[in-house]
Amino acid sequence: MNMLLTMLTNITLSTLLISIAFWLPQLNIYTEKANPYECGFDPMSSARLPFSMKFFLVAITFLLFDLEIALLLPIPWAIQVKDINTMTLTAFILVSILALGLAYEWTQKGLEWTE
């Protein structure tokens, strides 16, 4: 019962804060705030450079595999548990899912820099 009350309070508070942020936007919108600042001078060129979508996809793939390493690092300490089969199966499933994702990216040519 205590956990249910805590969850209900958290959901209510989150919904209330999101509603307030949505329904009470900032009324004073200044166009100067959207411009880049260069020591008080007008910028020489556009500050918003085009972003390579290929770089973004490779960066996201790198972050996924970096997360995999972070999730697999505790495995040597988990070997001390009594049920090692569950730990091994979980690690194998995690590596398999990420390997399938990498194979999919490779076949869809998502890791190619040139087109």
UniProtKB/Swiss-Prot annotation:
Q: Name one Pfam family in it.
A: Oxidored_q4
Q: Please give the start and end residues of each transmembrane region.
A: 4-24, 55-75, 84-104
Chemical reaction(s) catalysed: a ubiquinone + NADH + 5 H(+)(in) = a ubiquinol + NAD(+) + 4 H(+)(out)
Q: How is the subunit organization of this protein annotated in UniProt?
A: Core subunit of respiratory chain NADH dehydrogenase (Complex I) which is composed of 45 different subunits. Interacts with TMEM186. Interacts with TMEM242.
User: Which keywords label this protein?
Assistant: Electron transport, Membrane, Mitochondrion, Mitochondrion inner membrane, NAD, Respiratory chain, Translocase, Transmembrane, Transmembrane helix, Transport, Ubiquinone
Where is this protein found? Mitochondrion inner membrane
Q: Does the keyword tRNA-binding apply?
A: no
Summary of the function given for this chain in its UniProt record: Core subunit of the mitochondrial membrane respiratory chain NADH dehydrogenase (Complex I) which catalyzes electron transfer from NADH through the respiratory chain, using ubiquinone as an electron acceptor. Essential for the catalytic activity of complex I.
EC number(s) per entry: 7.1.1.2
Q: What is the recorded name of this protein?
A: NADH-ubiquinone oxidoreductase chain 3
